Amino acid sequence: DGEKRSFMLAVRDDAVLGICHFSAAPNNADRPERATPGGEMVGRLHSLYIDPDALGQGIGHALMSHALSTFAVWGCERATLWVLEGNSRAISFYEQQGWQLTGDTKVDRSFGPELHEQEMAICL
């Protein structure tokens, strides 16, 4: 199988309250230095954003649960994400869902200023 992608919206009364974008690719295709034998499908959570006025209503948990379930259906045994260093609210949320910091970091310059990010991973 090739790459798979999904984009979800959480909507209430025609208002978008949250978004989640995730994908899976065989053998860590976007990171050859971390390739795994046998073409293992690896999930990647690209974004999970909740309207600040909707925080604490279970929307993030519902979107995350759906993403993790979809990863499993796609045959992923693990998934990764990148979170901004210092974003303690997001890191805490991810840890509550079972994600763990891996110790890997990167600097993203694609939006102009340097964004320092930490990798998190979860076994499914």
Locations of regions flagged by a protein language model:
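Active-site acidic-Proline motif in GNAT/NAT acetyltransferases
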Residues: 51-53, 57, 85-86
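Internal amphipathic alpha-helical segments of the cytochrome P450 catalytic fold
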Residues: 7, 56, 90-91
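Acetyl-CoA-dependent GNAT
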Residues: 1-53, 64-66, 70, 74, ...
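C-terminal "cap" of GNAT-fold acetyltransferases
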Residues: 39-43, 77-80, 84-91, 95-124
